[in-house]
Amino acid sequence: MEVCQELRKPALSLECGHCSFRGTDYENVQLHMGSIHPEFCDDMDAGGLGKLIFYQKSAKLFHCHKCFFTSKLYANVYYHITARHAASDKWSEQPKEQPSKDTESGKSPSPPERQNPAFDPAEARPTPALPMEAQKTSPSLCPESQASGPPVLEPQGAGPLISPEPQAPCLPAEASKAAPVPCPERVDPPCELPELEKPERGPSPESVKSALVSSKPPKHSSFADTGAAPSALSPESPVLATSPEPWGPSLSASPESRKPARTASPEPRKPSPAESPELWKPFPAIASEPRRPTPAVSPGSWKPGPPGSPRPWKSSPSATSGPWKSSKPVQPMSPGPWKPIPSVSPGPWKPAPSMSTASWKSSVSSGSWKTPPTSPESWKSGPPELRKTALPLSPEHWKAVPPVSPELRRPGPPLSPEIRSPAGSPELKKPSSSPDLWKVSPDQRKTSPASLDFPEPQKSSCGSPPDLWKSSFIMESQKPNVFSETRKHTASGSSESPKVASDIWKPVLSIDAEPRKSTLFPEPTKAVLPASPEPRKRALFPESRKHVFLPELPKSAVFSDAQKAPELSEEIQLEAVDNAKCDSLAQEGLLATPKKLLDEALSPSSKKLKKDSQENSDAELSSSEYIRADLDTLDTKGQESSSDQEQVDVESIDFSKENKMEMGSTEQAKNVLQFTEEKEAFISEEEIAKYMKRGKGKYYCKICCCRAMKKGAVLHHLVNKHNVHSPYKCTICGKAFLLESLLKNHVAAHGQSLLKCPRCNFESNFPRGFKKHLTHCQSRHNEEVNKKLMEALESPLEEQQI
């Protein structure tokens, strides 16, 4: 057998294709490659039987394609396949081909049998066993085997011609194969199916090996038989069948012989060509490869197949007329036959697809298998892509809304301090400056930025095209002339959500310059924050423009504004006095605005401006003075070009929003300080220590034997089991918390104003959920909002141009 294998696989080298290993024989190289290079296992020929071993990388397991056999050692699966599936594979392939021959030529059965014994007693022996087997297999394979049969006959004729050596080893298997073919012809194919299956398995691995060994002769035989294959249908076909060798090579015959057979018989070979000569080439080296497709069905599947009904096989043959296909192509050639086969034994089919698509592709027509099984890899890649796309969508939406030019964002920071000075009231600034407030506020800042500030949404609001910004800036220039009017215009025109903007602007108008410092920003933040991030930015920006950034307006507008500013500022002051109370309340409501963003955004120049603004706030300058200072800064900064001025305006707008946020954050800090003081008054560590102690890295409950690694677990235990009062209580609502961090988050939520969606009636106190809603609502109403904004901005732009 070994000699035959060597003869059959002269092209196969004893060297490993992936390293410098050189084996003593083919099996040695196979075991080396499977053990040392398992990642290439799917493309390896298992004992010359085809790509029957699948390597599962995740579990580091080797699987048999034809059954459920699994092992962590390649050698175990290799020997399993050579022992269990070598003979059965040959038989499964041959019977398929033979039944097809039988169907094509019902007269030929007897001649092949006679010829087989004549050729060799060994052949004669297999033939008797084959009749039963052939009968069994023929029913299941009838169409396929029949189709394959003629080509097999051709190889038979050529087989003997090829060489006596291959014939000798192959004859037993071939004879058995040929004999089964005539038997199925004689007997009804349906009844014969089980028998054929058995003989397929029955043929000793030796016969299989011999058949494999005579892969070259099959080639010749196939070529010579090309003409004979059609004749196989006629009485000549039995004659061909008589030569056991041709049968061996043709059925289990190396893929090479099958290739010529395909070429020889135009119809059957056509389907087999579908498999592609390349696939067949590997098969010659691995006579089992053709078997693999059948193995894919698995011997188990073959058995059920016959009982199930020859129909599936028939359908498969119809799918593949070629005798060779009957063995392999049957599965690949037509999805239909494959489906029935799985129904016969779903188990084997499942493992096969789960195996590697590569192996399936090689064994079966690559096209058909690729599409149905789609390797798990393809599925994986697919879903991740979907996931990726889905994930990016949300950020993209946010970004799309934000499309504010980076320039606008950048310039903003330096202006923010200015905004702070005019916008923030001295009182607010003082607390913010105080270290205590800042210390406490950072937590709130963290929460607030995540909650109230949606940097992306804000960007998106800013993201409105520069034209919108320009228009808003122009509106600002108009604002100094008539604060109330300009505010209204800016609110309607510049804010992305006109409705929200108008609402926000109204309070702003009522508020005076000073109240704006402390309150205007917080109020707009309230209105703006609830509004979609876009409304926030624009609403905030228009406000900042109105109050603080009038100077940022174009020079011409700024000058006129500066002249009118004092008068307006006086009026605003009067309004501020009236609205100061409301502003203070609003400020208290805005606790969650983030300071971190403001600090990061501020540049050294902004810090200087901040100092100046703080001094002004300390002096409690009038709003007119603030406006003048702003105008001066704008004059100094924006004397370059109109475009530069516009950029400055954008920056100032961005930072006016930040100023508002800072104001809110300072208020938050105040609340937090109060809370911490009250909390300490509530309960002290000493009181907690009464019920809990720490030792050896663990916390112990003094009331019982409970102990835990973390303090929080023991606190929960004390509260739930021993009714100990929670150490941290909220002074606003009285709710108790076990951990200080939980209480801080709760208090911060109290400080936050109710978030309202500008596009619908949605309201929420939870910034995280509100942000999710905004993403949904924005994507839904984005187009409508953009249209409205464009329309609103067009009118102010036209006025400015005039």
Swiss-Prot record:
Tell me the residues on which Phosphothreonine occurs.
Answer: T371, T447, T593
Q: Where is the region Mediates interaction with MAD2L2? A: 261-479
In this chain, composition skew of type Pro residues spans 332-351
Q: Which residues carry this modification: Phosphoserine?
A: 108, 204, 207, 234, 237, 243, 252, 254, 265, 272, 276, 298, 309, 334, 345, 365, 375, 394, 405, 416, 421, 425, 432, 434, 441, 448, 451, 461, 497, 502, 532, 603, 605, 617, 622, 641-643, 665, 726
Instruction: Give any single GO term for biological process.
Output: protein localization to kinetochore
> Region labeled Mediates localization to the chromosome and the spindle and negatively regulates chromosome alignment — which residues?
581-802
* Compositional bias segments (type: Polar residues): 135-148, 369-378
Task: Specify where the region named Disordered lies, as residue ranges.
Answer: 88-475, 603-625
- Keywords in alphabetical order: Acetylation, Centromere, Chromosome, Cytoplasm, Cytoskeleton, Isopeptide bond, Kinetochore, Metal-binding, Nucleus, Phosphoprotein, Ubl conjugation, Zinc, Zinc-finger
Which InterPro entries is this protein grouped with?
CAMP, Znf_C2H2_sf, Znf_C2H2_type
**GO terms for CC?**
condensed chromosome; cytoplasm; kinetochore; nuclear body; nucleus; spindle
Subcellular localization, per the record?
A: Nucleus; Chromosome; Chromosome, Centromere, Kinetochore; Cytoplasm, Cytoskeleton, Spindle
What segments bear the compositional bias annotation Basic and acidic residues?
88-105, 185-203
* Principal subcellular localization: nucleus
- Residues with N6-acetyllysine modification: K479
**Assembly state and interactors?**
Interacts with MAD2L2. Interacts with POGZ, CBX1, CBX3 and CBX5.
Function text = Required for proper alignment of chromosomes at metaphase and their accurate segregation during mitosis. Involved in the maintenance of spindle microtubules attachment to the kinetochore during sister chromatid biorientation. May recruit CENPE and CENPF to the kinetochore.
The name this protein carries in UniProt is Chromosome alignment-maintaining phosphoprotein 1
Tell me which species this is from.
Answer: Mus musculus (Mouse)
